[in-house]
Each structure stands twice: as C-alpha cells, then as structure tokens.
C-alpha cells in the first residue's frame, strides 16, 4: 500500500476561542505552506515513522500510546478495525512552521 496526502496550513481570522462555546469562527487555508504524509510498504517488520522536522525517527511500538503521532495512527487502526498491522514506512514533512499558529499539527493529522 503506497499513499500520499497533503494538507494546507490555516489561519483563523476570528472566533478562535468562540468555537469552545459552540459559536462560529472564520478560518481560511494558507496554501503557501503544507504538511505531506507518505505511507509506503516497508521491507522491515513494523511501522516506522520518519518526521525530520520534529526530529522523530521511531518505530510505532517504541512510542507511548499517547504520543501525538502514535495516537493518530493507533486510532486509525481502531476506527477501521485493522487488527493485523501492516509493515509500513510513514514519512512526514511540513513547510508549516511549528508553533506558528498556522495549524501544523492539524495539517499533519488531516494528511
């Protein structure tokens, strides 16, 4: 299974905290920056995550289940009832600056 996905950054123009109270907000994509995720069949046994932008190079089982990236992967397996984990290389890259307010974490999750 080989797959590639990309998601843009975002900026919230107003209402960022209003959504907590079920009120509207206005957000727009920032297409000049993006997060990319590539999933490739791996010749190695296991699921290996390579995210150089955050200095993460690890096998899924070596990460705690509440690690942000590990938890998304584990929830996907659970949601789609995948009990037999495939051998994968997951490559994550992003041009969205971390902690910039442009939604780097959300873009990686969506991609």
Descriptions of predicted regions:
Residues 1-102:
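ATP-binding N-lobe of GHMP and related small-molecule kinases
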Residues 102-111:
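DPxDG-like acidic metal-binding loop motif
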């Amino acid at each position: 299974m080989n797959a590639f996905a990309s998601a843009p950054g975002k900026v919230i123009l107003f209402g960022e905290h209003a959504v907590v109270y079920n009120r509207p907000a206005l957000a727009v994509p920032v297409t000049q920056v993006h997060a990319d995720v590539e999933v490739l069949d791996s010749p190695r046994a296991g699921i290996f995550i390579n995210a150089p932008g955050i200095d993460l190079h690890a096998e899924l089982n070596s990460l705690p289940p509440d690690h942000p990236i590990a938890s998304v992967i584990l929830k996907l397996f659970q949601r789609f009832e995948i009990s037999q984990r495939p051998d994968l290389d997951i490559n994550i890259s992003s041009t969205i600056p971390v902690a910039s307010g442009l939604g780097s974490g959300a873009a990686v999750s969506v991609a």
